[in-house]
Curated annotation (Swiss-Prot):
Protein name: NADH-quinone oxidoreductase subunit D
Gene3D superfamilies on file: Cytochrome-c3 Hydrogenase, chain B (1.10.645.10)
HAMAP family cross-referenced by the UniProt entry: NDH1_NuoD
Organism: Nocardioides sp. (strain ATCC BAA-499 / JS614)
Entry annotated with the keyword Zinc-finger: no
Stated role: NDH-1 shuttles electrons from NADH, via FMN and iron-sulfur (Fe-S) centers, to quinones in the respiratory chain. The immediate electron acceptor for the enzyme in this species is believed to be a menaquinone. Couples the redox reaction to proton translocation (for every two electrons transferred, four hydrogen ions are translocated across the cytoplasmic membrane), and thus conserves the redox energy in a proton gradient.
Disulphide linkage map: none
Length: 446
């Protein structure tokens, strides 16, 4: 369409061509501007230094006004070479690396890696019952702490600072339990091939039951603050929409997939660590949006409390039971008393290892320095992390170190949905969509 047809008149000036219009011409002008796609578009970087991108995530947004026309994710700012480093450590030492990937759910990182090793060693059925129950207990505590961070940070990004405050208040209680049981608040390296590092300390079950009772009183606060808040609901409902077909096409899992109403949870569909013996329900929603993902995380914390109660009751009947496989060629002597430094350097430990048998000392030295050998082969074992399917593909060439260890991190896979969720929406809703995915960049970049 010619310019003179669009506008009522024009004239050439020293500043270029100037158009003049009358009050009746605005519809024609709007049509002309809509055809000129480059007119109003700008490209902005959101992140990697941004308080609302859940770490060092860079989003390249192309905007037209406040509408997002294209969204791309830039990753890699937190790459630490974890998978490559694991090839230069023993199978047991690898746990100390993988626990640092998704730093909000370290027990799940350890669990998927250890399950892969145990499958290659063919010792899955020989892991002590108490060790399996402790693994389930720790993972469900970890699920609660991770969901609390997701809800707290998501609320903070929307301006609901009270949600952030109480979310981190409860998470601190979980970290205190982790410190009591493992000695560390994060990066535990507690789940080992063949079992766990050590037994539960005295009084731990009482502390866990006290936490469960307290959380049952605290969780309704989140419903009062969020579900009953029309502003909070208005910012989440209909935002970041992605239906079941889109989730399956992109390989999305976790709350993002279950928000479409599809009850896919590996604890039910492909049980591990005895999850098939626990009574709990898979939480779903049917809105396929950010609000549904929030409600799923809130409901899953209730289910985790149910599992924790069952695990605590089982542990009460397993007092004194072993927590490490009896095979001395695989498991470190976890039944010995642990010193105050957490390194196993108690007097009983030293006396048994160094003072009773030269063969025992040699064997222990080789086990610690060289490690055990894993038969050649490969295995992929997934677990249901707070963010979705977290899997480890471990490959052995018959040596004492992994030939290859690769992880399928749900944050990496789910981050593909950024473009689909954000494009066509407002720039303010990009943050809501990202928060509903709940990515952890340590797991994305590794």
């Amino acid at each position: 369409m010619a310019d003179q047809d669009l506008y009522s008149g024009s004239s050439e000036t020293t500043e270029g061509r100037v158009f003049t219009v009358t009050g009746q011409d605005w519809d024609s002008i709007a049509e002309g501007l809509a055809e000129d796609e480059a007119q109003e578009r700008i490209v902005v970087n959101m992140g990697p230094q941004h308080p609302s991108t859940h770490g060092v995530l860079r989003l390249i947004l192309e905007l037209e006004g406040e509408t997002v026309t294209e969204a791309r994710a830039g990753i890699g700012y937190l790459h630490t070479g974890i998978e490559k480093n694991m090839e230069y450590r023993t199978w047991t030492q690898g746990v100390t690396f993988c626990t640092r990937m998704d730093y909000l759910s370290p027990f799940f990182n350890e669990m998927t890696y250890v399950l892969g090793i145990e499958r290659l060693l063919d010792i899955e059925d020989r892991v002590p019952e108490k060790a399996q129950v402790m693994r389930v207990l720790l993972m469900e505590l970890n699920r609660i702490s991770s969901h609390l961070v997701a809800i707290a940070t998501g609320g903070m990004e929307l301006g609901a600072l009270t949600v952030m405050t109480i979310g981190f208040r409860e998470r601190e209680l979980v970290l205190d339990l982790f410190e009591l049981i493992t000695g560390l608040r994060m990066n535990h390296a507690f789940i080992r091939p063949g079992g766990v590092a050590q037994d539960m300390p005295p009084g731990a079950l009482d502390e866990i039951r006290g936490f469960v009772a307290l959380m049952k009183k605290r969780l309704p606060e989140y419903a009062d603050l969020c579900n009953a808040n029309p502003i909070f609901k208005g910012r989440l409902e209909g935002i970041g929409h992605l239906d079941l077909a889109g989730c399956l096409a992109l390989g999305l899992t976790g709350p993002v997939l279950r928000s479409t109403g599809y009850p896919w949870d590996l604890r039910k569909t492909q049980p591990y660590c005895g999850y098939e013996t626990y009574d709990f329900d898979v939480q779903t929603w049917d809105t396929s949006d950010s609000y549904g993902r929030f409600r799923i995380r809130l409901n899953e914390m209730w289910e985790s409390l149910r599992i924790i109660e069952q695990a605590a009751d089982r542990l009460a009947g397993l007092d004194g039971a072993p927590v490490m496989i009896e095979d001395k060629k695989i498991g470190w002597p976890s039944q010995l008393a642990i010193g105050s430094d957490g390194m196993g350097n108690s007097l009983d430990h030293i006396r048994h290892i160094m003072g009773e048998s030269m063969e025992a000392l040699i064997h222990h030295f080789k086990l610690v320095t060289e490690g055990f050998r894993v038969p050649p082969g490969q295995a992929y074992v997934p677990v249901e992390s707070p963010r979705g399917e977290l899997g480890a593909h471990v490959v052995s060439d018959g040596g004492t170190r992994p030939f290859r260890a690769h992880f399928r991190d749900p944050s990496f896979t789910n981050l593909q949905a950024t473009s689909v969720m954000a494009e066509g929406g407002m720039v303010a809703d990009v943050i809501v969509a990202i928060a509903s995915i709940d990515p952890v960049m340590g797991g994305v970049d590794r």
